């Protein structure tokens, strides 16, 4: 969570240690425990996903499988409960031998679906969100994790009698009986159950495009990203059919305007047959997080350009980078910048991708030169904070276009770019 006063990013331990945030985020975590466990009276209903147990109740053959829990906080403006806390399980210590791969729609599939909506007459778009998607999936094999008693708000401690269950080393042990965030098997188990339930109503997932679902005869299809449905439909009665099918087994939220999906803001203009996608405010928040101010001189170039040697018949590669290696904190800073902006670049601002690719290629062993590239990139981002991509109706016939630059990367490498664009009217 971003502290707008200091620009620092705060985790749960920081939030409950700050008098300004302690009450609100304590309530948020209490609600999360209630959802996962057996509820919090008057606030949330439980899903029986987790059960608090005594340490001696752990099966003797599962001691080595006990993992940790992590409390993740996020502020979600578009959600009904804006202070969002999620308790996740340390999946890196789970010994699950089955297949954990979960088909999910990638950004290319999502963008093609949006393009298809405005390219097809009489089509509309909506999105559906399943609440507690993972938490409704029974698991044949239970998992176990532990948390410090100090992490729990007082009302949760009293509600579940945790002082009677805490171990001598201050930990509370939990048994996971249904799918939960962080478990490597949670995604595939939840999707297999969804597939079984929707098949009864005529919906199946594409064999060739992960995360794309269709009905066997209704004019409706949707992309699925974890628990978010982006639905393309002709005729509201067909969308109502999907919503009703989901409501048989899940609690769902619907947005009939289809204005938000995968963190992307969507502005539909069905009359002009255009759609505009953006992520307003994302870059500004990132710049505050990285304590990077907008430069006084506008930066219109996301990465350095390679100056050619004019008149030379042969262009030689740049000399090797011999600048100072970065320390651990500086290296982590580089990695955070790349991780933060990569999704934004892929989603709405592809002009950032060559620069991010160049920085990412050296983030394992970054140098002072890498930091200079990163600062220039942040200057560019700060000067161009709210990119918008507009898709116009097309015949949805795809052509391949590619291009490459010569000796523009270290070690005599070239930078290549590729794109798939509709042949008729492009973006």
Predicted regions and their residues:
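Long, low-complexity, charge-biased intrinsically disordered regions
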Residues: 1-427
């Amino acid at each position: 969570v971003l502290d707008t006063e200091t620009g620092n990013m705060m985790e749960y331990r920081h939030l409950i240690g700050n008098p300004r945030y302690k009450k609100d985020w304590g309530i948020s975590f209490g609600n999360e425990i209630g959802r996962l466990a057996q509820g919090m009276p008057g606030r949330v209903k439980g899903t029986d996903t987790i059960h608090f147990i005594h340490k001696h109740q752990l099966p003797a053959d599962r001691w080595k499988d006990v993992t940790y829990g992590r409390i993740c906080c996020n502020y979600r403006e578009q959600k009904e409960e804006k202070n969002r806390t999620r308790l996740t399980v340390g999946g890196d210590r789970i010994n699950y031998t089955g297949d954990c791969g979960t088909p999910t729609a990638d950004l290319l599939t999502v963008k093609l679906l949006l393009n298809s909506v405005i390219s097809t007459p009489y089509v509309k778009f909506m999105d559906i969100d399943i609440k507690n998607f993972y938490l409704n999936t029974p698991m044949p094999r239970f998992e176990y994790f532990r948390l410090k008693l100090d992490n729990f708000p007082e009302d949760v401690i009293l509600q579940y009698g945790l002082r009677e269950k805490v171990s001598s080393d201050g930990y509370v042990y939990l048994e996971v009986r249904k799918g939960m965030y962080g478990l490597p098997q949670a995604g595939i188990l939840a999707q297999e159950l969804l597939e079984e339930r929707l098949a009864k109503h005529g919906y199946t997932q594409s064999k060739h495009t992960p995360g794309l679902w269709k009905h066997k005869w209704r004019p409706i299809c949707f992309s699925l990203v974890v628990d978010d449905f982006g639905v393309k439909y002709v005729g509201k009665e067909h969308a109502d059919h999907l919503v009703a099918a989901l409501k048989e087994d899940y609690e769902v939220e619907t947005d009939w305007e289809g204005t938000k999906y995968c963190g992307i803001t969507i502005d539909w203009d069905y009359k002009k047959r255009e759609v505009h996608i953006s992520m307003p405010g994302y870059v500004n928040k990132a710049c505050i997080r990285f304590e990077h101010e907008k430069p006084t001189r506008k930066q219109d170039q996301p990465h350095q350009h390679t100056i050619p040697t004019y008149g030379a018949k042969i262009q030689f590669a740049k000399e090797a980078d011999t600048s100072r290696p970065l320390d651990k904190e500086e290296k982590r800073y580089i990695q955070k910048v790349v991780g933060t902006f990569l999704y934004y670049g892929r989603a709405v601002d592809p002009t950032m991708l060559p620069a991010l690719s160049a920085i990412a290629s050296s983030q394992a062993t970054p140098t002072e030169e890498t930091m200079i590239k990163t600062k220039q990139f942040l200057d560019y981002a700060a000067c161009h904070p709210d990119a918008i991509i507009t898709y116009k109706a097309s015949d949805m016939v795809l052509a391949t276009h590619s291009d490459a630059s010569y000796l523009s990367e270290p070690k005599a490498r070239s930078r290549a770019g590729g794109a798939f664009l509709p042949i008729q009217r492009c973006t």
